[in-house]
């Protein structure tokens, strides 16, 4: 079965002067899940004239940091392609919208964590590890978590900033065993097992996105408290299914206490299940 390739695409040709709004879907999903929201946005003439809508698709079973690398590099390539001379200020006002796991990818575009990631993952400097240069370069790319200078606004929908209790469940971890990782990641794992005991431990704790979104995982422990970079405005849309105290509510997949983060400009709580992007 052919693996889904990470890619960034637009529904229409690039239009100068319109700010890209990039939608990033969640686990076991696809860009098609944004259809209802997209229809609503396109029916608003004011929004339609101000924004152009792009979509990022990826294999959601891959490690979160690996998928974030693909998103980061896709955005950088796209902007360099559509605005070669740097003459369109609209592309430097990018809006990112992420649902569920997609929200984690979005946040990784708006925080500076490279130094902490290197310290947490590696017991010795990357340059001192004995491994093929190809593997070393892939690690550099994966941990290069720096706020992209053209991202100005991020919107989180039902995002498990502190992990999902569903991802931490027995069934999820059994299913994660069947995830087929990209060849790059498999080779990286093999090389690392022979070079760095600390990184070996991190890798053996689980490579798939399911493990990365487990409450208490190294990734969410580091990412949840990380502040958005200066100049980036954040918004949270959090779904709950009940009417009880928010700290006890969930959307069936993500608890309110996981979706809530400090430092955002606004937080809207709606009554919905986890697939809030398809509800009106």
PLM feature spans:
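Conserved alpha/beta-hydrolase
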Residues: 45-61
């Amino acid at each position: 079965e052919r693996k889904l390739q990470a890619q960034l695409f637009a529904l229409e040709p690039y239009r100068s002067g319109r700010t890209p709004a990039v939608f990033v879907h969640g686990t076991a999903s696809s860009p098609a899940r944004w259809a209802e929201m997209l229809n609503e946005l396109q029916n608003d003439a004011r929004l339609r004239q101000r924004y152009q809508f792009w979509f990022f698709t990826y294999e959601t079973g891959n490690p979160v940091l690996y998928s974030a690398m693909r998103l980061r590099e896709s955005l950088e390539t796209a902007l360099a392609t559509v605005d070669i001379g740097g003459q369109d200020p609209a592309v430097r006002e990018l809006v990112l919208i992420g649902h569920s796991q997609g929200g984690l990818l979005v946040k990784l575009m708006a925080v500076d964590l490279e130094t902490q990631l290197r310290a947490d993952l590696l017991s010795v400097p990357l340059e001192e590890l004995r491994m093929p240069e190809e593997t070393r370069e892939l690690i550099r790319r994966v941990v290069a978590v720096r706020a992209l200078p053209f991202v100005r606004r991020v919107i989180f929908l039902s995002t498990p900033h502190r992990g999902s209790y569903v991802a931490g469940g027995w069934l999820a971890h059994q299913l994660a065993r069947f995830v087929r990782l990209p060849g790059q990641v498999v080779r990286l794992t093999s090389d690392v097992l022979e070079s760095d005991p600390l990184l070996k431990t991190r890798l053996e704790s689980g490579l798939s996105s399911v493990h990365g979104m487990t409450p208490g995982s190294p990734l969410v422990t580091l990412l949840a408290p990380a502040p958005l970079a200066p100049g980036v405005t954040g918004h949270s849309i959090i779904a709950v299914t009940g009417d009880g105290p928010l700290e006890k509510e969930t959307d069936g997949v993500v608890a309110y206490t996981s979706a809530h983060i400090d430092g955002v400009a606004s937080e809207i709580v709606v009554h919905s299940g986890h697939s809030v992007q398809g509800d009106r």
